[in-house]
Amino acid sequence: MSEDEISIEGDLFEEPEGFLPERPSSHFSTYKRKIPNAEPQEITMKLVGHNPLYGHLLWNAGIYTADYLDKHSDTLVQGKKILELGAASALPSLVCSLNHAKEVIVTDYPDPDLLSHMEYSFNDLKEKTKYELSPWKVKGYIWGHDLGELLFDEPGRKLAEEEKFDLIILSDLVFNHSEHHKLLDTCRQSLKRNGGKCLVVFSPHRPYLLQDDLSFFETAKQYQFKTEKIEMVTWKPMFEEDEETADIRARVYAFFLIPEWE
C-alpha cells in the first residue's frame, strides 16, 4: 500500500495526552555523617524517580548501615574488599569508599536507569571531595547468579579464596522472602572463610511478616553461617499510616553472619 492510498492525520501510535501517568523524576537525597569532623560531612545521592523494588527511597536501614560502617570503619572497612548487594541508593558503599576500603563492588538489579544513578552518585562524590575515593565498580547482578561473570566477565569462573570479600552488605533485603536462598548462596560463594562477615540490616516493613523476615537467619544455618545480633534500635517509621504497627515498623535490626565452614 502506497502512502497515497491512506492518510491518517496525527501519529497513529502516539498515546492520547494524559493516557499514562507521567514518570516520576529523579530526585536527590542528602545524608549527614555522624562522625565529628568527617570530610565531607554530607553525601548526596541521586535516586530514581520510581523503582518496583523501592530503590527510589533512602530507607532507615540504609542510614543505619552507613552510620555503623562509618563508626566502625577501622575494623570493617579500611583495607577490606567490600560487596554490597541490592544497593539502591548505594549509601553504605559511598561511605565505604570514603573510609579507605581496598575495593568496593556495588550491585543491584541490572536496570540501566538504577545503575546509572548509583554511578552518578559516586562520580558526584569524587568531584566534591578533596580526598581520593576507594576503587569502586557499579555492576548489575541478580542474586544467585554467576559470580565469575560479575567480577571478572568470565562466566563459570570460581572465586579463589583470596579473591573473595571481607564484608558483604545486605541492607533492607530480607523482606524479599522468596530470595533468601539466592542471597545466602551468593554470600556463601563470595565471602572469605577467615575473618569475613555479612552485615545484615533491615526494618520490618510488613509487621505481620516479621517472622518471615527473621526466618532468613534460620535459613542461614543451612549455608553454615552463624548469626550474631548487633542490636535492635527504634527510629521514626518511614511512613505514618497504620499507627497500630508503627512501633514495629520503627525498628531497625542489625546482625552479622559469620562463616562456620572449614
Swiss-Prot record:
Keyword annotations from UniProtKB, A to Z: Cytoplasm, Methyltransferase, S-adenosyl-L-methionine, Transferase
InterPro entries given in the database record: EFM7 (IPR025784), Methyltransf_16 (IPR019410), SAM-dependent_MTases_sf (IPR029063)
Presence of keyword Heme: no
HAMAP family, sorted: Methyltr_EFM7
Locations listed in the record: Cytoplasm
Family: Belongs to the class I-like SAM-binding methyltransferase superfamily. EFM7 family.
BP GO terms, sorted: methylation; rDNA heterochromatin formation
Entry protein name: Protein N-terminal and lysine N-methyltransferase EFM7
Organism domain of life: Eukaryota
Molecular-function GO term, any one: protein methyltransferase activity
Role of this protein: S-adenosyl-L-methionine-dependent protein methyltransferase that trimethylates the N-terminal glycine 'Gly-2' of elongation factor 1-alpha, before also catalyzing the mono- and dimethylation of 'Lys-3'.
